[in-house]
């Protein structure tokens, strides 16, 4: 579970190892399906907590970086682990609850629902926590962004994970015809419908404006004492002056120097 959690984080920026999803989620479905009747709640809680920790510790490892901006806070950087543990516990509790009350629902449909529900609950608790959404997995693919435009982040997250779980159906071949009918009715047909709508909207949208966008991720070395705040600011200013783009975006860890 710890390994699967870590591998799941590689689907997200900046890695975007998209094909991994077709290995990770069928494996997770197989584990859950084989153990859902035999595992105790305590054992399940431990397993899902390990999955969450493996996922969040790599995916949100950068959260510690703001602690290194100032000398006064760098000794408190381990505080970021509290966020990792809290998110892991939330994910684990939701997994246990949904699996307990959804015993008769195929695991193929439960897994995407669990992750999407977790995404929603975390966004409510943390007032729109912006980093935990599986819709980010397709953010580097302009051809798949129609899903975000048409569905929004939550439904896009569900669809992405549901597609990743597809190999599980063919591996187990349990209730294959029934699950394929559900999949066609609730997933495939809506996607085809929205693809057609997306193509039509592009054809009808005659007013377009192209702008140049440049994104900066200036990862200053925290252990480099020669990099004073003034030097970091000068580096940011130099990048701004050299850029010819219409819109510039800097990462949040560069804001303290602006």
Explain the meaning of each model-derived region.
Residues 197-258:
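Soluble catalytic regions of membrane-associated enzymes that act on cell-envelope
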Residues 1-201, 256:
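Membrane-embedded alpha-helical bundles of multi-pass enzymes
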């Amino acid at each position: 579970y710890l390994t699967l959690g870590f591998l799941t984080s590689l689907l997200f920026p900046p890695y975007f190892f998209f094909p991994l999803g077709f290995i990770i989620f069928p494996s997770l479905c197989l584990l859950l399906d084989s153990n859902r009747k035999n595992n105790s709640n305590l054992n399940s809680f431990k397993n899902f907590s390990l999955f969450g920790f493996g996922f969040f510790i790599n995916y949100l490892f950068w959260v510690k970086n703001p602690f290194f901006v100032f000398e006064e806070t760098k000794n408190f950087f381990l505080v970021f682990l509290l966020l990792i543990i809290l998110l892991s516990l939330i994910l684990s509790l939701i997994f246990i609850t949904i699996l307990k009350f959804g015993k008769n629902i195929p695991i193929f449909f439960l897994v995407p629902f669990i992750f999407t529900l977790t995404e929603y609950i975390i966004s409510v608790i943390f007032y729109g926590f912006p980093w935990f959404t599986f819709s980010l997995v397709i953010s580097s693919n302009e051809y798949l962004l129609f899903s975000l435009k048409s569905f929004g982040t939550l439904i896009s997250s569900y669809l992405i994970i549901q597609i990743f779980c597809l190999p599980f159906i063919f591996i187990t071949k349990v209730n294959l015809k029934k699950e394929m009918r559900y999949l066609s009715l609730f997933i495939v047909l809506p996607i085809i419908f929205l693809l057609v709508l997306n193509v039509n909207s592009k054809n009808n949208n005659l007013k377009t404006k192209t702008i140049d966008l440049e994104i900066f991720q200036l990862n200053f070395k925290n252990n480099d004492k020669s990099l004073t705040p003034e030097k970091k600011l000068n580096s940011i200013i130099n990048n701004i002056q050299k850029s010819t783009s219409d819109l510039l975006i800097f990462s949040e860890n560069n804001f303290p120097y602006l």
